[in-house]
Each structure stands twice: as C-alpha cells, then as structure tokens.
C-alpha cells in the first residue's frame, strides 16, 4: 500500500513542479498567457499587471500594456476616419 502512495506523491510532485515552472517561465516574457477579468486584478507574476485591451484583458508588463493601448487607440482612430 505504501508503494502506491509513494507513486501518487511522486506524480503529484512532478505536476506541481511543472506548474511552477510554467509560471516562472512566463514571468520573463512581455506578455503572459494568463488572462484576467478586471484591470485591478493581480496577476500571478509580480512584474505583470492586468491590462485592458481590444481582444481580452491579459497580464503583461506595464510598459507593454501602455504600448498596446496606444496602438489600439491609433488603429481605432484610423478605422473611424475611413
């Protein structure tokens, strides 16, 4: 019975480490694969903020969020002028 418990614990540990590695890797990038609901919501990466933009609110670095929002405004203005 203890052999079964050891295998279960080992598998659970591997899955948990994989999830932690995914979060750590995505914190280095400008954009996260994590989506959020509201701009005040916290992201799992301390370097990312919840950014509201055209497609869907997404966690990203603050500077990238500012660039994305400026780009969306410019595209919207060009579309309205046509």
UniProtKB/Swiss-Prot annotation:
**What post-translational modification information does the record give?**
Contains 4 disulfide bonds.
List the signal peptide residues: 1-25
Instruction: Specify the propeptide location in this chain.
Output: 77-82
**Tissue spec. comment:** Expressed by the venom duct.
Q: Does the keyword Thylakoid apply?
A: no
Organism domain of life? Eukaryota
Q: One GO CC annotation, please?
A: extracellular region
Residues with 4-carboxyglutamate modification:
30, 34, 37, 40-41
GO MF: toxin activity
> Where is it localised?
Secreted
Primary site of residence: secreted
| Keywords noted in UniProt | Amidation, Cleavage on pair of basic residues, Disulfide bond, Gamma-carboxyglutamic acid, Secreted, Signal, Toxin
What residues bear Asparagine amide in this entry? Answer: 72
**What does UniProt say about this protein's domains?**
The cysteine framework is XII (C-C-C-C-CC-C-C).
Family that this chain belongs to: Belongs to the conotoxin I2 superfamily.
**Under which name does UniProt file this protein?**
Conotoxin Gla-TxX
Organism source for this protein? Conus textile (Cloth-of-gold cone)
């Amino acid at each position: 019975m203890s052999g079964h418990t050891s295998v279960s614990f080992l598998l659970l540990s591997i899955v948990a480490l994989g999830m932690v590695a995914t979060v750590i890797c995505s914190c280095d990038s400008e954009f996260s694969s994590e989506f959020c609901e509201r701009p005040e919501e916290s992201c799992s990466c301390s370097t990312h903020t919840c950014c509201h933009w055209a497609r869907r609110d997404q966690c990203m670095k603050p500077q990238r969020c500012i660039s994305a929002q400026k780009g969306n405004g410019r595209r919207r203005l060009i579309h309205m002028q046509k």
